Amino acid sequence: MNNLKWVAYFLKSRMNWIFWILFLNLLMLGISLIDYDFPIDSLFYIVSLNLSLTMIFLILTYFKEVKLYKHFDKDKEIEEIKHKDLAETPFQRHTVDYLYRQISAHKEKVVEQQLQLNMHEQTITEFVHDIKTPVTAMKLLIDQEKNQERKQALLYEWSRINSMLDTQLYITRLESQRKDMYFDYVSLKRMVIDEIQLTRHISQVKGIGFDVDFKVDDYVYTDIKWCRMIIRQILSNALKYSENFNIEIGTELNDQHVSLYIKDYGRGISKKDMPRIFERGFTSTANRNETTSSGMGLYLVNSVKDQLGIHLQVTSTVGKGTTVRLIFPLQNEIVERMSEVTNLSF
């Protein structure tokens, strides 16, 4: 079937030749019918020989010219086609040379842009790490504040700044996340408690507590740093859109998979917004005047969850709250997925 495709392509590209040769032969036959001095038998012989030789010529040309395009169809690298001299006709060589020059130029641009992106990533990473020093010093100064009301307000703003810096750092590292992962069995409860501790200043100001209920063995096979980032972003959203209601956090076992749920009783997500919650920079259409949301939290979560093998479920009702469920994979599922990725890279 594939050969028939190439035959059809070849005949279509040579259709003007074929029509011209047929026209010339029909013209000779027409002249022989008008002019009786032309021996009709000899002319039929010449026309038959001419058409036969033309057929042989087309077959030989087909095998010679289609060979290069079959290499293209097999997705062979242009470098291999050029260096192995697989182009046979002058026009084919010219085409291959042109493609080689263009692809080489584009590859150089890609390498240059990748270097610029790496430098940009390194610059932002260094900036975030550098600014963490005065932010940490600021925390020490805030701890010395004796006015509790003022201290609480300052800690609230400090927690927001610290959270935004961490988010920016993770955004910068998104491109290199696969190289930055190390899988091991870690305690889900320990990660959740550590993240709750980081958000305690915000939750205290907003009058929000945490009801934690871990019913099953909470050890999961994951990367602790990126998994904590996911939990942090979900907790941050729950705190941001809730007031004076506790956030419920717990684990369940579904088909041998540990699942973590985080349930808030905030304003919820509308049905029209639900399909877009993972888009970069998307914020709720219900509160366009709100400036505290960057729309990056769930985008980060969605960008990382597949690498961790986590299945994410979000359910929400406007005015009643949102439940986010993280379903963690088994170890053999992670190993199998990583093996597939490794095979694809080769």
From Swiss-Prot:
GO molecular function terms attached to this record: ATP binding; phosphoprotein phosphatase activity; phosphorelay sensor kinase activity
Protein localization: Cell membrane
Disruption outcome: Deletion leads to complete loss of resistance towards host cationic antimicrobial peptides (CAPs).
Cysteine pairs bridged by disulfides in the record: none
Result for mutant: P39S: About 50% decreased resistance to host cationic antimicrobial peptides
Cellular component aspect of the GO annotation: plasma membrane
Sorted UniProt keywords: Antibiotic resistance, ATP-binding, Cell membrane, Kinase, Membrane, Nucleotide-binding, Transferase, Transmembrane, Transmembrane helix, Two-component regulatory system, Virulence
Pfam short name (any one): HATPase_c
Histidine kinase domain boundaries: 126-332
One GO-annotated biological process of the protein: cellular response to phosphate starvation
Protein's membrane topology: Multi-pass membrane protein
InterPro entries the record matches: 2-comp_sensor_kinase, HATPase_C_sf, His_kinase_dom, HisK_dim/P_sf, Sig_transdc_His_kin-like_C
Catalytically driven reaction(s): ATP + protein L-histidine = ADP + protein N-phospho-L-histidine
EC number per UniProt: 2.7.13.3
Transmembrane segments: 15-35, 43-63
Subunit structure as annotated in this protein's UniProt entry: Interacts with GraX.
Record's function text: Member of the two-component regulatory system GraR/GraS involved in resistance against cationic antimicrobial peptides (CAMPs). Functions as a sensor protein kinase which phosphorylates GraR through the auxiliary protein GraX. In turn, GraR up-regulates many genes such as adhesins, exoproteins, transporters, toxins, and proteins involved in cell wall synthesis. Down-regulates the expression of many genes involved in RNA and amino acid synthesis or glycolysis.
Protein name per the record: Sensor protein kinase GraS
